[in-house]
Design a protein with these regions (language model features):
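A short glycine-threonine-serine/GTX helix/turn-capping micro-motif
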Residues: 1-10, 23-27, 66
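A general structural signal for well-ordered alpha-helical segments in protein cores
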Residues: 9-12, 37, 41, 62, ...
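Residue-level signal for inorganic ion chemistry
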Residues: 15
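Structural signature of PLP-dependent enzymes
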Residues: 19-42, 52-61
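Flexible, glycine/charged-enriched surface loops at secondary-structure junctions
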Residues: 27-33, 49-56, 91, 146-155
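A short beta-alpha structural unit
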Residues: 52-70, 122-124
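Conserved C-terminal alpha-helix-loop-beta "cap" of PLP-dependent enzymes
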Residues: 65-120
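PLP-dependent enzyme catalytic core of the Aspartate aminotransferase-like
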Residues: 96, 100-162
């Protein structure tokens, strides 16, 4: 039992309006985000060596791309991306601010060191193809800059020569 008048009527009306706005053109919004996500994933995997998609290639949220970049530290990569106007995260939204690798990636069996080099891009309906192009233009150079300073990357390059 509730007493009459205790319901949050403005909140209920606001929730109804929010749901209406969310589901207006819902399929078109999902299609747009999926297209942007797929372009981002394809472009990064093609332009950055030792880069892989974490998770299933198609059975994933339309707005989510989690990319593992080997031989770089995820937090450093995030800092450089941020300095270039690119927003990303190294863990799940519920663990933002933590330096630990994503517990989800660890549960998927991704080794600790590879999970530490993983970043998550979360897209929204406001994102544009031009913004994806900026990421695809800037991120490969940022990763290369980081690898050029990495002794581990130097070992990998030497091993590839032999």
């Amino acid at each position: 039992g509730r007493r009459a008048g205790t319901e949050n009527v403005p909140g209920i009306v606001g929730l109804a309006k929010a749901m209406e706005l969310t589901y207006t053109d819902f399929d078109a919004k999902i299609e747009k985000m999926t297209k942007l996500r797929d372009k981002l994933i394809k472009g990064l995997l093609e332009s950055i060596p030792y880069c892989k998609l974490n998770g299933h290639p198609t059975k994933r949220l339309a707005n989510n791309a989690n990319i593992g970049v080997e031989y770089v530290e995820g937090e450093s990569l995030l800092l450089l991306l941020d300095m270039n106007g690119i927003a990303a995260s190294s863990g799940s939204a519920c663990t933002s601010g933590s330096l630990d690798p994503s517990h989800v990636l660890l549960a998927l069996g991704i080794p600790h060191e590879k999970a530490h080099g993983s970043i998550r891009f979360t897209l929204g309906v406001q994102n544009t193809e031009e913004e994806i192009d900026v990421v695809l233009e800037k991120m490969p150079a940022i990763v290369q800059r980081m690898r050029d300073m990495s002794p581990l990357w130097e070992e990998v390059k030497n091993a590839m020569k032999n």
